[in-house]
Design a protein with these regions (language model features):
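P-loop NTPase motor catalytic core
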Residues: 15-309, 313, 332
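Short, loop-centered acidic/histidine patches that primarily coordinate divalent metals
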Residues: 29, 321-322
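Short polar catalytic/cofactor-binding loops
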Residues: 1-2
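Short, cationic low-complexity segments
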Residues: 11-20, 341-343, 347
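Conserved GTP-binding G-domain of TRAFAC-class P-loop NTPases and closely related GTPase folds
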Residues: 181-194, 198, 202, 312-316, ...
Length: 363
């Protein structure tokens, strides 16, 4: 982003003197009174656990969540979202540059099972995969052995699609509950994976099948919610203990205002479904925070699918991506207001399933 684009956004340093940035300020256009005098620009300030300015690297972002995602090895359900307006960088945050994440077919990243390209633009998903395999390997000395499997799906117009299925596959994907009440999806492919390279191949396959379209806000916009799931089943051959963790890494479709985008036909329907599901996500988080007797998980496929990971037994983190463009200032403010509400919610204390003899904590 250029300096002119960022002129309406400031990142004040935390006042406690540690140099961290935990606030963001946005400035609207100069307000003119009825007499023609300037009233100054309207200011909006929001406080969060952490704010990343434009110069922050992908590694800076991942370091903030690295302990959180690793706790899946400890038997926790972990959920990481990227939320924001279309074109604000959610997919870059979660995946990085498409070719940098997985390489093209036959590239060195595909042939080397332990390799992630070293250009620094890899996102949360490939960095998480690398860390999980490295950490699980280091736990072998303590007797732990892990079986990892991955799935990748998208929710498009309230319909679930398996991004790892062969093109043309015509199966119905229903959300179901097992005897213990845990959520699963029928017919979804789970690939057992033994190294990062295998996961990167799956990511590349999924990216080619995801629903993309040009919009007025973004020439290459994701029109679906994508959900990458990594299932981690561990067993300690010395103690007999077991651990079952799940990682949900989610790139939410971009929110848009119909009046501003002027969508018609299929694009209009897509936007309506996207906005409704994002609204349902906010409703669920609010209900959890208010300790409501009824949590409206089933109001959308997204919240229904993530019921296990949104509830109080999970660890959940949301990235909010903000566009630097002046014309999207109002949408950015709306995103930050939603994020502030989410940040104020306490949905309970996470509980793990199983027992691993090391501890991690979320930030």
């Amino acid at each position: 982003a250029s300096e002119s684009e960022l002129s309406q956004i400031e990142f004040p340093v935390d006042e406690d003197g540690n140099g961290e940035i935990k606030s963001i300020q946005l400035f609207g256009e100069d307000q003119i009174s009825a007499t023609g005098q300037s009233r100054g620009a309207k200011e909006f300030r929001f406080d969060f656990d952490k704010v990343f300015p434009p110069q922050a690297s992908q590694q800076d972002v991942f370091e903030e969540v690295s302990q959180l995602v690793q706790s899946a090895l400890d038997g926790y359900h972990v959920c990481v979202f990227a939320y924001g307006v279309t074109g604000s960088g959610k997919t870059f945050t979660m995946e990085g540059m498409s070719e940098s994440v997985v390489g093209s077919p036959g590239s060195s990243s595909s042939s080397n099972p332990d390799m992630i390209l070293g250009d620094g633009v890899e996102g949360v998903i490939p960095r998480t995969v690398q860390q999980i395999f490295h950490a699980s390997k280091s736990l072998e000395d303590q007797g732990w052995e892990y079986t990892l499997s991955a799935s990748f799906l998208e929710i498009y117009n309230e319909t679930i699609r398996d991004l790892l299925a062969e093109p043309g596959t015509n199966l119905k994907y229903d959300i179901k509950h097992d005897r213990e009440g845990h959520v699963s999806v029928s017919n979804i492919i789970q690939h057992e994976v033994s190294d990062p390279g295998q996961v990167h191949e799956l990511l590349h396959r999924a990216s080619r099948q995801r629903a993309w379209a040009a919009t007025n806000c973004n020439a290459h916009s994701s029109r679906s919610h994508s959900v990458f799931q990594l299932f981690l089943n561990g067993r300690n051959k010395l103690s007999g203990k077991t651990s079952q963790g799940v990682l949900n890494l989610i790139d939410l479709a971009g929110s848009e205002r119909l009046k501003k985008t002027q969508h018609t036909g299929d694009r209009k329907l897509e936007t309506q479904h996207i906005n409704k599901s994002l609204s349902c996500l906010g409703d669920v988080i609010a209900a959890l925070a208010n300790k409501s007797s009824h949590i409206p998980y089933r109001n959308s496929k997204l919240t229904h699918l993530l019921q296990d990971s949104l509830g109080g037994n999970s660890k959940t983190l949301m990235f909010v991506n903000i566009s630097p463009n002046q014309e999207q200032l109002s949408e950015s403010i709306s995103s930050l207001r939603f994020a502030a509400k989410v940040n104020a919610c306490e949905i309970g204390t996470a509980r793990r399933k199983g027992g691993v003899d090391f501890n991690t904590s979320s930030k």
